[in-house]
């Protein structure tokens, strides 16, 4: 482990962490959850933080506010955690190494190419804390993620250990580029390699363009955070088109956050008897802020069967106990208009998940509101009973269609 030592006091305007000629106010910590780690019978234990007798923690103020991190924010805020002014004086060096990340090249170059950046960096903790970093790798690999995709991780962010990151100002272009990217709404996710024996698996890096500081958050619930961040990264990849270029502003719709992207396929009846046409649309599923919908196991294509709503009245109790999500369809306007017309005329969509898929969801229902012009998905909590109920509904529908067909044939025969 790197022996803790006092960080040099920096003043003046030099560097992104420099002050402005006056010492910052002393700061305190409040509204932080307990720093004790819950006992875990399995898996690696969370990072150990030894608290010694010391003055109250300085350098961090934690508020309960929630807001965006950006050039206009008074501090770092994400998921209810806000980090205000910091200074490196009275902090102890916990780790030294190199941070590596990739950023897009300038617009005039190949948009699919990435530029690798590296900077020497150090992590500092407050006096009285000891972050076990002796097993940390000498190089940390960081992935940049839009902050808007991380709001669902608020509870995990609030229960985190803070460490301040400082970059040695040897490469001004790299440092300015990192400040510019993170100041425009990106956060850094550092995933530690599994071959590393340290107990930390993931660390988040945030930046305040106003305070000129980088703050690292080490979630205490490492396993829960790793699972959640993997879903975020998967969702990000699904929302990005070929070559890593965004297919459009589909991450947020009406303050909802993207949970899944793929294709919806269904069949529509045609004017000819017993004839159907196959239709499909690119689709996206959104959830409310603060909610997590685990979609990493969802298939890329969902198959929907159109059912008359009048046949679903027996399933109303199961509908009431459902989770709501919002569907958004893009591209083919004529196909979308046709789907809206059919569902507005009394049909609902039953989306079946393939049994090959390992996700827990087996079926969800899609409804359309012509008044609000939105598609709502209902995911019943009682999947087993709902699957059995919907099977009975589909069987009844087939019987009704068969009877109607027989009656039409009889009427034609009598008319002849």
UniProtKB/Swiss-Prot annotation:
A GO-annotated cellular component: transcription regulator complex
Keyword Iron-sulfur: no
Major subcellular site: cytoplasm
Biased composition range(s): Low complexity: 27-36
InterPro entries linked to this entry: Med25_PTOV, Med25_PTOV_sf
Region spans: Interaction with FLOT1: 184-416
Keyword Isomerase among record annotations: no
Tissue specificity field: Expressed in brain, heart, kidney, liver, placenta, skeletal muscle and small intestine.
Signals that turn on the gene: By testosterone.
Function: May activate transcription. Required for nuclear translocation of FLOT1. Promotes cell proliferation.
The protein's name: Prostate tumor-overexpressed gene 1 protein
Native source species: Homo sapiens
């Amino acid at each position: 482990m790197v022996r803790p030592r006092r960080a040099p006091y920096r003043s003046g305007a030099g560097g992104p962490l420099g002050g402005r000629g006056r010492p910052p106010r002393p700061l305190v910590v409040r509204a932080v959850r307990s720093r004790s780690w819950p006992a875990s019978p399995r898996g690696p234990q969370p990072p150990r933080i030894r608290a010694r007798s010391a003055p109250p923690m300085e350098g961090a103020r934690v508020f309960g506010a929630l807001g965006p991190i950006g050039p206009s924010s008074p501090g770092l805020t994400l998921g209810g955690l806000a980090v205000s002014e910091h200074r490196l004086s009275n902090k102890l060096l916990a780790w030294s190494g190199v941070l590596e990340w990739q950023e897009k090249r300038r617009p005039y170059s190949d948009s699919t190419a990435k530029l690798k950046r590296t900077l020497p960096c150090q992590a500092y903790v407050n006096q009285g804390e000891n972050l076990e970093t002796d097993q940390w790798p000498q190089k940390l690999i960081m992935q940049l993620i839009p902050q808007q995709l991380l709001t669902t991780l608020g509870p995990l962010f609030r229960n985190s250990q803070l460490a301040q990151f400082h970059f040695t100002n040897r490469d001004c272009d790299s440092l300015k580029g990192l400040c510019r990217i993170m100041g425009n709404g990106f956060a850094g996710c550092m995933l530690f390699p599994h071959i590393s024996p340290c107990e930390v698996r993931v660390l988040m890096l945030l930046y305040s363009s106003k305070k000129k500081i980088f703050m690292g958050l080490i979630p205490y619930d490492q396993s829960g955070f790793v699972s959640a961040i993997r879903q975020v990264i998967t969702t990000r990849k699904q929302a990005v088109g070929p070559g890593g270029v965004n297919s459009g502003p589909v991450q947020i719709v009406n303050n909802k956050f993207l949970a899944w992207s793929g294709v919806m396929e269904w069949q529509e009846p045609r004017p000819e008897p017993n004839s159907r046409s196959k239709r499909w649309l690119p689709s996206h599923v959104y959830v409310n802020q603060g909610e997590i919908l685990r979609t990493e196991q969802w298939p890329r294509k969902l198959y929907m069967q159109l059912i008359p709503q009048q046949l679903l009245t027996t399933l109303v109790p199961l509908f009431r106990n459902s989770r709501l999500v919002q569907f958004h369809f893009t591209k083919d306007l004529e196909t979308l208009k046709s789907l809206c017309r059919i569902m507005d005329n009394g049909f609902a969509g039953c989306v079946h998940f393939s049994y090959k898929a390992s996700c827990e969801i087996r079926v969800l229902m899609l409804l359309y509101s012509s008044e609000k012009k939105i598609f709502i998905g209902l995911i019943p909590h009682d999947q087993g009973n709902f699957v059995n109920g919907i099977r009975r509904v589909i069987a009844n529908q087939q019987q009704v269609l068969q009877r109607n067909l027989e009656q039409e044939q009889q009427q034609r025969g009598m008319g002849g």
